[in-house]
Regions:
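Flexible, compositionally biased loop and terminal segments
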Residues: 1-245
Length: 245
């Protein structure tokens, strides 16, 4: 069941994370890139467990971009294996902790057995009311927007929707993330300062925090630092606030 977003701008309801730096972490240690991804999975597993100490309702993770198909076939195969590993090994614990799992993105090019695992995870946790874990896999912000536009266009052509009544609410209801509030905070690890085609519609008023450490080195204290930084910011949402009292 969807929770209402917080009305208090100083509370964090939804954090989205670009988990960058696995490959560089491995390379700096003379290890194959896949070892970095495995270490990154350990970091993710521990962070999700640590979230019980934070008042957070939604967590979105950017795990695999559509653009990642440009990487060597062996690496993309191993990244598919990583999601299999996560669902197979961690789903029971997530379900027991009342976590709802939702995987967003296109299913194109994803092996059928992995699609079946994804569907099973979503079905099993559908009625869970704890943390909403949204995993962006085979995802692109531009693709999400184009897909939503196509769905709306089809509805309009079929006479199911008056084009003059199309607004942001209708558009958002056709996104992969329909029903999930926009992120309050975007965290990117790995020192790069870009958003890499992630949640392009949803992050219009999100605060962005760039963390220098590589994803496998990210931990609870690093997340706490990001949240503390967020708390010091003034979120105007296009408005004017009194900064002097």
């Amino acid at each position: 069941m969807k929770k209402n977003p917080s009305k208090n701008e100083k509370e964090i309801n939804h954090i989205a994370i670009i988990m960058d730096g696995n490959g560089r972490w491995a390379s700096s240690r003379g290890l194959p890139r896949y070892e970095g991804h495995l270490e990154g999975l350990k970091t993710l597993r521990k962070l999700i467990r640590d979230l019980k100490d934070f008042k957070l309702n939604y967590l979105t993770l950017f795990t695999f971009s559509i653009d990642n198909w440009k990487r060597p076939k062996e690496e993309t195969f191993r990244l598919m294996q990583l999601l299999r590993k996560f669902i197979s090994n961690d789903l029971s614990e997530l379900h027991n902790n009342n976590v709802r799992v939702k995987i967003i993105g296109t299913r194109t090019n994803i092996p059928k057995d992995l699609i079946d695992l994804i569907k099973g995870a979503e079905k099993l946790t559908l009625n869970n009311t704890g943390l909403y874990l949204q995993i962006a896999f085979n995802y692109s912000g531009r693709h999400e927007i184009i897909n939503a536009a196509k769905k709306i266009a089809v509805s309009a052509v079929n006479g199911e929707l008056d084009p003059n009544k199309i607004d942001s609410n209708i558009f958002e209801s056709n996104l992969y993330s329909a029903g999930v509030p926009d992120p309050d905070l975007i965290v990117r690890t790995g020192s790069e300062k870009r958003i890499s085609n992630f949640l392009l519609w949803q992050l219009s008023y999100s605060e962005v925090y760039f963390e220098e450490c590589l994803w496998p080195d990210f931990n609870k204290s690093k997340l706490d630092e990001a949240i503390k930084d967020f708390m010091l910011r003034s979120r105007r949402f296009g408005n004017i606030i009194n900064e002097f009292g």
